[in-house]
């Protein structure tokens, strides 16, 4: 069975919140912190089961940020890693189709970093920090 790749909708929000709440080190971001008020991204499903999602921050440059990749903590099938790879590759295609040339992401999860490496992303081995402020 192949994966279904689609854009996020308002109906996905409660699912995403439940995933963020289930992962102990994650924080649920406010909707208005995310692109298009929580709908600016992609989700990967299999047999109508959502597996992984990520958000695409389009900029006024040739770059797009791929952020807030979150997965279904209850999905334990062997193709979980493949679903994450599909999300990233689909995001790349989506960005290319929108005339973007660069993608940028921030991460600390080793498994996710390794998937990016496998997909030929450049990884800066020096630690960096997300710095935010509500103004």
Where are these regions (language model features)?
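Short amphipathic alpha-helix that is part of the acyltransferase structural core
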Residues: 1-29, 127
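Active-site rim helix/loop that mediates acceptor-substrate recognition in acyltransferases
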Residues: 17-47
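Conserved beta-strand in the GNAT
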Residues: 43, 48-58, 64-67
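Conserved acetyl-CoA binding element of GNAT-fold acetyltransferases
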Residues: 62-79, 129
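Conserved acetyl-CoA-binding loop-helix of GNAT-fold acetyltransferases
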Residues: 77-93
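Conserved beta-strand-loop-alpha-helix junction that forms the acyl-donor binding cleft
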Residues: 103-114
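Conserved active-site tyrosine of GNAT-family acetyltransferases
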Residues: 114-121
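Conserved catalytic-core motifs of GNAT/GCN5-like acyltransferases
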Residues: 122-135
């Amino acid at each position: 069975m192949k994966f279904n790749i689609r854009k996020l909708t308002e109906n996905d929000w409660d699912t995403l919140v439940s995933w963020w709440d289930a992962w102990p080190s994650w924080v649920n971001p406010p909707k208005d912190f995310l692109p298009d008020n929580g709908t600016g991204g992609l989700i990967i499903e299999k047999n109508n089961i959502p597996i992984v999602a990520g958000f695409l921050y389009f900029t006024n440059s040739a770059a797009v940020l791929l952020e807030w990749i979150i997965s279904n903590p209850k999905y334990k099938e062997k193709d979980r890693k493949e679903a994450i790879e599909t999300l990233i590759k689909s995001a790349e295609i989506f960005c290319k189709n929108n005339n973007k040339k660069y993608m940028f992401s921030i991460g600390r999860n080793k498994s996710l970093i390794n998937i990016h490496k496998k997909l030929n992303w450049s990884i800066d081995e020096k630690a960096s920090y997300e710095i935010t402020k509500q103004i």
